[in-house]
Amino acid sequence: MSSSSHRGILKTEALTKYLLETSAYPREHEQLKGLREATVEKHKYWSLMNVPVDEGLFISMLLKIMNAKKTIELGVFTGYSLLATALALPQDGKIIAVDPDKEAYQTGVPFIKKAGVEHKINFIQSDAMSVLNDLIADGKEEGTLDFAMVDADKENYLNYHELLLKLVRVGGIIAYDNTLWFGSVARSEEEEMMDFERAGRVHLMKLNKFLASDPRVELSHLSIGDGVALCRRLY
C-alpha cells in the first residue's frame, strides 16, 4: 500500500511516508507484506479496511507484552490484523476470528498458511452478535479471553462492548479500531462530509463518549492508524 493511501489521521503525506518507511515497513513480516500487497491488488480502494502497518506492529507488541494466548477478532476482511495477531501469539495460542464475508478472508489464507499459524485460527463465517451471544450462552468462554480486536460494523460497537466485557478477563484488553473515523469526529455537523463518514461519525462519537465515562474499563485513546481505543477491563 502506498503511503498516500495509508488510512490514518496524519494529514502530512511526508510525515506518513517517513513513519512507514523508517519504522514500519522494515519491521513488517514477509507474509504480512505479501498479504498487504495482495489486498491492494485484489480489493483496490477497500484495502483501506485493513489496519495500517504501524498499527499492526503496535498490536503485535501489545500482545507480546500481555503474554496473550487467547483472543477474538470481530471483523477480519483479508486478515492483516488477524495474521499480525497470530504471529504474536505463542504456538498454542488461539484466535476466534469472526466475519460474515469469507470470500475476502480467502485472500489472506495463503499467507496465513505460509506463516505457519493457521492452526491458531478458528474462522467463523457469521455476524459478530450471534457468535458473541453463543459464546456467552455456552458459558465456557466467559472471562477467558486476553484480548479482543473490534473492527466491524460501527453501529454495533456499543453492543459488542457489553458482550465482550463478559468474555474478556479482568486485566484483558478490548481494542476498538477506527475510533477517529478519518478525523470526522472532530468536525462540526455542518461541515461537508462523505455519506459514510457522516454515518460512522455518529456511532463512533457515541462510543468515544461512553468509553470515557465507563467505570468498568481503563481507557487509552490512541491516534494511531484511524484511531484505536484501548479498554482494559477493571472488574
Curated annotation (Swiss-Prot):
GO terms for molecular function: metal ion binding; O-methyltransferase activity. Its cofactor is a divalent metal cation. GO terms for biological process: anthocyanin-containing compound biosynthetic process; cyanidin 3-O-glucoside biosynthetic process; delphinidin 3-O-glucoside biosynthetic process; methylation; pigmentation. Optimum pH is 8.0-8.8. Its EC number is 2.1.1.267. Optimum temperature is 49 degrees Celsius. GO terms for cellular component: cytoplasm. A divalent metal cation binds at D151, D177, N178. It is found in: Cytoplasm. Coiled coil: none annotated. It comes from the Eukaryota. S-adenosyl-L-methionine binds at V51, E73, G75, V76, S81, D99, A128, D153. Transmembrane segments: none annotated. Pathway: Pigment biosynthesis; anthocyanin biosynthesis. Keywords: Cytoplasm, Metal-binding, Methyltransferase, S-adenosyl-L-methionine, Transferase. PROSITE patterns: SAM_OMT_I. It catalyses: S-adenosyl-L-methionine + a 3'-hydroxyflavonoid = S-adenosyl-L-homocysteine + a 3'-methoxyflavonoid; S-adenosyl-L-methionine + a 5'-hydroxy-3'-methoxyflavonoid = S-adenosyl-L-homocysteine + a 3',5'-dimethoxyflavonoid. Mediates O-methylation of anthocyanins. Anthocyanins are major pigments in grapes: at ripening initiation in red grapevine berries, the exocarp turns color from green to red and then to purple due to the accumulation and extent of methylation of anthocyanins. Catalyzes both 3' and 5' O-methylation of anthocyanins, with a preference for glycosylated substrates. Active on both anthocyanins and flavonols in vitro. Most active with delphinidin 3-glucoside but also acts on cyanidin 3-glucoside, cyanidin, myricetin, quercetin and quercetin 3-glucoside. PANTHER family: O-METHYLTRANSFERASE-RELATED, TAPETUM-SPECIFIC METHYLTRANSFERASE 1. Belongs to the class I-like SAM-binding methyltransferase superfamily. Cation-dependent O-methyltransferase family. CCoAMT subfamily. This is Flavonoid 3',5'-methyltransferase.
